[in-house]
Regions:
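Extracellular glycosylation-rich, acidic/polar low-complexity regions of adhesion-
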Residues: 1-239
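N-terminal propeptides
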Residues: 238-269
Length: 269
């Protein structure tokens, strides 16, 4: 599974693709170039993708399903200049079913011909997969919260995961995520349980001078290796972990309070 851009939705909720997310990714991968237009290279295998789903756009056409045979023929403009152009902000995904991941691929172009090919991963679960948060002090390793990830996925999908696949690794400036004594990767399925190659063997070692927040997105896999949802583990690397009397680690804002307190912005909730 690949997810350069990631979205989560529920079975009954239409998902609008955010054109600005694609533009930001394009700038990141091209060191600052602007996205002009894109073409789709694949469409979701599950669910339906539409252009102008709500029939409110003045650009392009009326509501139009985008299928494997038609999607590649349409050019979507980031900033359409005429009514005949198709507006990139008018892509809408309609889920079908629950507890799965699907994707759409695209190639973006700048005005001078620079291209970026990437994938949008869409997770559809009965309820959103909660973010899992851990905190550590700078230079101190922290174990991957395997049990919390399992619980978050089970709560959202009603099913237990068998393994996870990481979608992105921490930036080198932040530190290294290890599996045992080796650097982790984005192709291995790390099993839930103990032993070599398991989630419990994952640990993040921040660089000695780094403080900040690290996000580790993942897809949860069932016993067949099929994705049942995606989520994210966030690790706060702080100068010191302060104790609070007005919130606990399960409070929704604990992540933000912890990191702001470490930066001496606040002293509690």
């Amino acid at each position: 599974y690949v997810g350069n851009i990631r979205y989560n939705t529920t079975p009954s909720t239409a998902l609008q693709i955010n054109a600005n997310d694609i533009a930001r990714l394009f700038r990141k991968y091209t060191s600052g170039e602007a996205l002009q237009y894109l073409t789709l290279t694949s469409v979701p295998a599950t669910g339906s993708l539409y252009y102008n789903y709500y029939n409110t756009s003045k650009y392009g056409s009326a509501q139009m399903p985008l299928t494997a045979s038609t999607a590649g023929n349409v050019v979507f403009s980031y900033s359409p200049a005429s009514a005949s152009e198709y507006d990139l902000s008018e892509l809408t995904y309609i889920p079908s079913g629950s507890n799965y991941c699907t994707s759409l691929g695209f190639t973006g172009y700048s005005s001078n011909g620079t291209t970026v090919s990437a994938t949008i991963l869409i997770s559809v679960t009965a309820s959103p997969v909660s973010e899992v948060y851990s905190v550590t002090t700078k230079g101190t390793s922290v174990n991957f919260p395997a049990n919390s990830v399992y619980s978050a996925v089970a709560s959202a999908t009603g099913f237990g995961l068998s393994s996870i696949q990481l979608l992105e690794l921490p930036a080198s400036k932040a530190g290294v995520l290890y599996s045992g004594s080796y650097a982790a990767d984005v192709t291995t399925a790390y099993s839930y349980g103990d032993g070599t190659g398991s989630m419990s063997q994952l640990r993040f070692i921040p660089n000695s001078g780094f403080t900040g927040s690290v996000s580790i997105p993942y897809v949860a896999l069932n016993s067949s290796g099929t994705a049942i949802g995606s989520g994210v583990v966030s690790i706060g690397v702080v100068d010191s972990v302060k104790k609070f009397t007005d919130i606990s680690t399960s409070t929704w804002c604990y992540k933000y309070v912890t990191e702001l307190a470490s930066a001496n912005v606040i002293s509690g909730y």
